[in-house]
C-alpha cells in the first residue's frame, strides 16, 4: 500500500503537469514580421551593403518573347508563384570604397505603392545615415530607382550627396519636350523622374556622365542601354575581385537567365535590351565577377555561370564578414 503522503505527491505532480500542458496549449501570436532588409559583404576593399526597398508583383503578361502558357509553366516548375503576379524585389546597393560612400539607385519611395519605399530605413538599420552618403549613382531614371531620392515633401533624402545619371537617360527622362511627345498616359514616369531630380539640380548637385567614364577612383560607368536610352551599370574594380551593379539587366530571374531573349514591356528598345543582356551575361560568366541586380531576389548579389545554351544565377551565401577571404 502506497503511503498517503506519496499519493499526495504524485497527485501534485499530475496537477502540475496538467497546468504546464495547459500553458503550452496557448503559444504566443505569430509575429509575421521580417528582419530588416540589409545584407553586407566585402568585395576586395569594397564594403557592399544590399538594401531592400520592397517588392512589386509583376504580371507575367509584361514579359515578352515567350508564350504565356509556357512562361507560367516554366515559372511554376521553379516554384515561382504567378497567381498574383511574380513577386519581384527592388534593391539598392551601398558601397563604401574606403574613400566614398556610394548609393547605387534609391528605391521607389511611395511611387509604386506601400510594398516599397524601405531603402532609407534599411540603410539606417545597417548602421549608416542618409546624410553620410556622398555619391548617388542612378542606373537609370525609372521611378522604382529614383523616387526614393526625395521624401514626401519633395526634400532630398540624401542632402550631402552629389547625384549623377547618364547623359542619354537625363536627356530623355528629364526633357519636357520628350514628355509632351508621348501619350498622356505615359507621362507619369517623366514627371516622377523630374520631381526626384529637381532638388538636387536646384542645389547644383546633379551632373551627368558618359559611358566608360571613371566616376571615382576604381569606379567605371558601363554602357548597358536598351532598357532605357542611357541605362548604365557600374563596375567597382580593385584587387582580385570586381563587382558589377547592373540595374535592370534582369527583371525575371526565373526566365531571363534561361532565355535572355525574353524582354519586358518597360524596355524602351527591346531588341537592344536583349542584346545588352546577352553581352552582360557572357561577360559576367567569362570574368567570374560579382554581380548585383536591382530586381534579383534579395540580396541580389551573386555570380552568373553558363548553363547549356543559357545561363544560371548563383546567389551569394549568407555569412559573417570574413577577413581571410
Model-predicted segments: where are they?
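Active-site environment of divalent metal-dependent phosphoester hydrolases
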Residues: 36, 59, 141-148, 172, ...
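Active-site metal-binding motif and surrounding structural segment of the metallo-beta-lactamase
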Residues: 91-92, 114-164
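Conserved beta-strand hairpin/beta-sheet module of binuclear metal-dependent hydrolase folds
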Residues: 33-126, 233-250
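Bacterial N-terminal signal peptides
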Residues: 12-22
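Cap/insert and terminal regions of metallo-dependent hydrolase folds
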Residues: 235, 239-325
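Active-site metal-binding loops of divalent metal-dependent hydrolases
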Residues: 53-54, 106-109, 141, 168-169, ...
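Metallo-beta-lactamase
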Residues: 27-28, 117, 124-128, 132, ...
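Bacterial N-terminal signal peptides that target proteins for export
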Residues: 2-13
